[in-house]
Amino acid sequence: MSPLLLRGARLPGEGVRDVLVSTDSGLVARVAPPGLLPSGPDELDLNGYLLLPAPAEPHAHLDKALTWDLAGALPGDLLFAVTAWRAYAARVTEEEVFQRARRAVDELCANGVTAVRTHVDLLRDDGGYGGGDPLRGLRALLRLRRQLRGRIRLQIAVLHVDAPDELLHEALDLGADLLGDCPHLSANPAASVERTLRIAAEHQVGVDLHADETLDPGAGDLRLLARAVLERGFVSGVTASHCVSLGVVEPAEAARTAKEVAAAGIGVVTLPLTNLYLQGRDRPSSTPRGLTAVRALLDAGVTVAAGGDNIRDPFNPVGRADPLETASLLVTAGHLTPDEALYAVTGGARAVLGLPAAGPHEGAVADLLAVRAQTVSEVLGASCPERLVFAGGRLVSRTSVVREFF
């Protein structure tokens, strides 16, 4: 295949450049000032666009996506949302999960995403995990992963609460990439963390835990996980998502925990959209923000990513599948700089997913996002929908806008 030349794009901090990408290797081959690279049969004019690393979505729930109206959900806190989802999930089919997840992935792709880590529930009926096929959501997403190969990388984490060991083994044998857990919903959080690490180690897969999804400063999932990882010497990759309670403890305690997390090599995913929506409903005065201690984690050297979490389901009726919205919220609610916030949904997200660096730099993976803007602050502030998305150097999505004034 012929290489693709992207002409006249603006790179953050570097000015206007021409970027040559190899569609064979999927890497950026050359970056040069305008006019220095020879013309070829495949060129795109990106004048007026800012060229960025393509975002990755480190935390999605594609099996739940687009069910807010279907489930008849009402606003409420986390446990209210869990109850609403379980009631709906008891009758959901594999085909329905597949179709909704496909629509959600199309939204993510159009917004710039080229890699997604999605959690998928082991589906229960009212009697627990024994009725129907608890793996039907996983089967739907495995089919979707096969269908999307070459356009988007899909990692699947099996999410459970006190599910039988044999069901977890079966899910991983089917092809799930990681093992998830919600220890704060378990009858025995410490035992749940230990079991998750044990089974993941047996299958040589990573883990991604929903940790401390509460404003209770006494919650301790993250510390439990860090200490268990250090004691076990777990090496397959560990992620802790949410970690909300870390944001409401005293700064010295947050710093101590962050150091333990860094020592254990755990990546943390903050999820501002859903946590701002679900958390703090019982505190009508001086309501906490429901975010983890992002600055303390960064200062300790922890890899921090940011995700969108829910896409219009019982856990958040307004999720837009747009990492640039997530980054914008990190500036507003997390007090990160625009550059830090953008990194959380690009480089930080890819690092948590275990993917190599991407972006408009020689030798990097040619997963790229071109946005009609001039600066990073404009990208996050205006959230312009005019975007071109490249996966492995290949154009996979283009959104154009017609705006008329009368």
Indicate residue ranges for each PLM-predicted region.
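Alpha-helical scaffold segments that flank or form the walls of functional sites
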Residues: 68-119, 125, 131-147, 169
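Active-site gating loops and adjacent loop-to-helix segments of metal-dependent hydrolytic enzymes
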Residues: 65-97, 170, 175-176, 203, ...
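Histidine-rich, glycine-flanked metal-binding segment
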Residues: 1-52
